[in-house]
Amino acid sequence: MKLKFKVQPYQTNAVNDVVDCFVGQPMTTGLTYRIDPGRKAQTSAFEEGFKNADLALTDVQILENIQKVQRRQNLPVSQSLTDFTTFDSKGARVPVKAAYKRDALAATRVHLDVEMETGTGKTYCYIKTIFEMNKRYGWSKFIIMVPSIAIREGVYKSLQITADHFTENYGKKARFFIYNSKRLHELESFSSDAGINVMVINIQAFNARGADNRRIYEELDDFQSRKPIDVIASNRPILILDEPQKMEGAATMEALPKFKPLFIILL
């Protein structure tokens, strides 16, 4: 049985609002870099990787784009890229804690907070955003970060069931996988593949104390004495935080800069 997806106008509008925050960014594809070969004795074609192009826009240009989107949607207008807010227990917007802002800005200067209610197709929207970002700007490396294993499995299932739908609409197929510290060949492919690549990771994979969870920060013999986090960071991935209100713990926030995200989208 093949599922049919009806695209809702509000979903398309939400995707365009996010993508329009980078109007003026040049289309760049195939930006290569040398993947750290570790202790490999010989070079190989797989040592060439493809990373996201850096932001070419100035802070002023990005802020102006964001403000245009906010005015279009009748939203409060941000006065700076550091104008971070969150919700209190009554649903009112309040400034974020100083420690949160410090760690967030250490990760990247650009944070896009997209408000969508549960049941409105949020996961569909950010998967579509991935394809639109690739279509308009050439960015191809994405990480979807989630607060739990259950949500991780749900996101992965959504990627599976929408795969044909997005291939039909964009003429491209995304490669996606769940990060597993014992299947690091998938991370190697994430770096070396030129197409759209999506890694799904739950925060326990990098902020917990267990031996398996700490492997992401360790030089591993079975990974040519490299640290997985360094290989991830070299891609300058776009980081999508699904349910970020459940990921505001100190261990998670302090880890975000290590991923070296190009920018962060919060949904």
Q: Where are the regions that the model predicts?
A:
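RecA-like P-loop NTPase motor core of helicase/translocase proteins
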Residues: 1-267
